[in-house]
Regions:
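Short, glycine/acidic-rich hinge or "gate" loops at secondary-structure transitions
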Residues: 50, 143-153, 446-451, 522-525
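A glycine-rich dinucleotide-binding beta-alpha-beta segment and adjacent secondary-structure elements
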Residues: 183-199, 232-237, 386-394, 412-496
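A non-catalytic, amphipathic alpha-helix used as a structural packing/dimerization or gating element
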Residues: 123-134, 426, 430-434, 511
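FAD cofactor-binding and catalytic pocket of flavoenzymes
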Residues: 75-88, 97, 101, 121, ...
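A conserved FAD-binding loop/helix module that cradles the flavin
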Residues: 494-516
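Glycine-rich loop(s) and the adjacent beta-strand/alpha-helix scaffold that form part
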Residues: 33, 40, 44-54, 229, ...
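Conserved redox-cofactor binding core of oxidoreductases
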Residues: 66, 77-78, 117-231, 463
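N-terminal glycine-rich phosphate/pyrophosphate-binding loop and immediately adjacent elements
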Residues: 2-126, 268, 285-308, 317-320, ...
Length: 525
């Protein structure tokens, strides 16, 4: 007998998981496979398995965005005192933002965790290493060894051969003294694979929170899913969650919760905790430290076009090459990886990029500003020709004043305040110089003049640690203040690394899931 959403919301569950992305989907699968009854609640729609739409900022109405699995409302960001509203690359559907991600799953460096100069991790790299390996297996990660890594190389699946143009470019880099390798990617490359970088995958080919997490969890028979269920607030006593206030099918209802695992993303989870103000939690849930929402980090994108020395026929742009030559220079600077973007320097790609830049700029409110982007886009295509687009990911550092802010007048909106600190601007300048030196034998052109925050990589807004005064979560990502709340998205991270956070989110979710499975089984005996 098929159960309705109302039936499911009224049942008792071992855990309710809010969010179905890299963190929520992964931990839900672990718990379900260990025999625990799990309910996923997802703000967005279930969608159709055959969908292949990309996450476009050109869809403006909330209803149309929600239907496509996009976060429905614009983010309000005040950066260096200037406020703009724009649609960030955030998903709201089964799989969350990971349904649209480019499937890059790379490990950080040991020094990112063990000896970071400005952030303390309560666990070491060796504590995460087996969970990185398990996540790489779960997400079918393929790629090649990083020739610069002193660590034991991960056992990855073999990736398909490089496109001839990428293979030629890789040789050019090696001849220049660089150390390129095949980027680590969570794509199975099944027959008819389109890569689906930046778009939903209609096959179980691109492995994300949906395909590697939620769907296998549902297949166990121990998990269920309720979509279009927006959690408005957590409810409870001073030391425990007792339930959730949700909006489902246009009606507000209260559901009881034995245990809650929050995985709504670093922006969404912080917003929900801050929105859960009550007599028991005057500053929001799990916020006795006052740190919920603070220490927000992104990455800075340094996008540049690079012209191969030789024009080699190929299948077009691919996200296949990564380099770590600039990750951690000898002078101690903290930079990051350089990767191919998986996009060509074509009109559509450049127009999309320019429109994103304009939406975040002071020109955003000018009439027809989006149409004005067509002119420089057309000129750029003629100028760039056969160039390939690369991006350098520059590590961000957490500062308390960089934060998610709750607006009671717009309780569902994502609001951030962010200041680019002088040290970040200095590191950005040094990073750009390092890129110029590293690729000095190639013609290149930076595609942005102003610092560009990567709003798809937020993290750090509920960092974990051993001291309740300086962290929100304990070593196992349980809220210090509450006995039955865990947070397993990128909120937990004390530092942002120089790589995409997705693999670390999944590995940490596996770590926490294994701990909870053991603990809950012991409690039941």
């Amino acid at each position: 007998m098929t159960q309705t959403a109302q039936d499911l919301l009224g049942q008792d569950w071992d855990a309710i998981i809010i969010g179905t992305g890299m963190g929520g989907g992964t931990i839900g699968r672990v718990l379900a496979e260990n025999g625990f009854r799990v309910l996923f609640v997802e703000k967005g729609p279930k969608g159709h398995r055959s969908e292949r739409q990309a996450l476009h900022s050109e869809v403006f109405t909330p209803e149309a965005r929600q239907l496509r699995g996009f976060w429905p409302d614009p983010v309000k960001a005040t950066v260096d005192g200037r406020t703009a509203e724009f649609f960030a690359p955030i998903g709201a559907g089964v799989g969350g933002s990971s349904a649209f991600y480019a499937a890059t799953l790379e490990r950080p460096e040991r020094h990112d965790i063990d000896v970071h100069p400005s952030a303390t991790w309560p666990i070491g790299y060796d504590d995460l290493a087996p969970h990185y390996a398990a996540a790489e297996e779960m997400f079918h990660v393929c790629g090649a060894d990083d020739p610069l890594s002193p660590e034991p190389q991960p056992k990855l699946r073999q990736a398909p051969p490089l496109d001839p143009s990428d293979a030629s470019l890789k040789v050019e880099f090696e001849s220049s003294g660089l150390h390129p390798y095949r980027l680590h990617s969570a794509i199975r490359y099944v027959e008819g694979c389109h890569g689906c970088l930046g778009s939903k995958c209609p096959k179980t080919c691109k492995m994300d929170g949906r395909s590697a997490g939620v769907e296998p969890a549902l297949a166990t028979g121990n998990a269920e899913l309720v979509t279009e269920c927006d959690v408005l607030a957590l409810e409870g006593s001073a030391d425990a969650i007792t339930g959730l206030r949700v909006l489902h099918m246009g009606k507000t209802r209260h559901i009881s919760a034995k245990r809650v695992i929050l995985a709504g993303g670093a922006l969404g989870s912080a917003r929900l905790l801050l929105a859960s103000q009550s007599d028991a939690w005057p500053e929001g849930a799990a916020n006795s430290s006052g740190l919920v929402g603070r220490n927000l980090m992104f990455h800075l994108n340094e996008m540049f076009a690079l012209w191969p020395k030789r024009k080699v026929a190929g299948d077009g742009a691919s996200k296949a090459i990564s380099l770590r030559d600039l990750y951690h220079p000898r002078d101690g600077s903290r930079f990051g990886t350089v990767q191919s973007m998986g996009i060509g320097a074509g009109y559509g790609e450049i127009l999309h990029y320019l429109r994103l830049m304009l939406a975040r700029s002071a020109l955003a409110k000018l009439p027809l500003v989006q149409d004005l982007a067509r002119i420089p886009a057309a000129l750029a295509v003629k100028m760039l020709g056969n160039a390939k687009v690369f991006v350098g990911l520059l590590e961000d550092i957490g500062y308390p004043e960089n934060r998610v802010v709750f607006d009671p007048d717009r309780p569902a909106s994502l609001n951030i305040e962010y200041t680019l600190h002088p040290e970040l601007r200095r590191r950005r300048g040094a990073f750009r110089k390092a890129i110029r030196r590293a690729f000095k034998s190639h013609r290149k052109l930076f595609l942005s003049m102003q610092p560009e925050l990567n709003f798809g990589h937020p993290c750090g807004t509920a960092r974990f640690g051993s001291d309740p005064a300086t962290s929100v979560l304990d070593v196992n990502c349980k809220a210090h203040d509450l006995e039955n709340l865990w947070v397993v998205d990128s909120s937990f991270m004390p530092s942002s690394f120089g790589v995409n956070p997705s693999l670390t989110i999944a590995a940490n979710a596996l770590r926490v899931g294994a701990h909870l499975s053991k603990e809950w089984r012991h409690d039941a005996e």
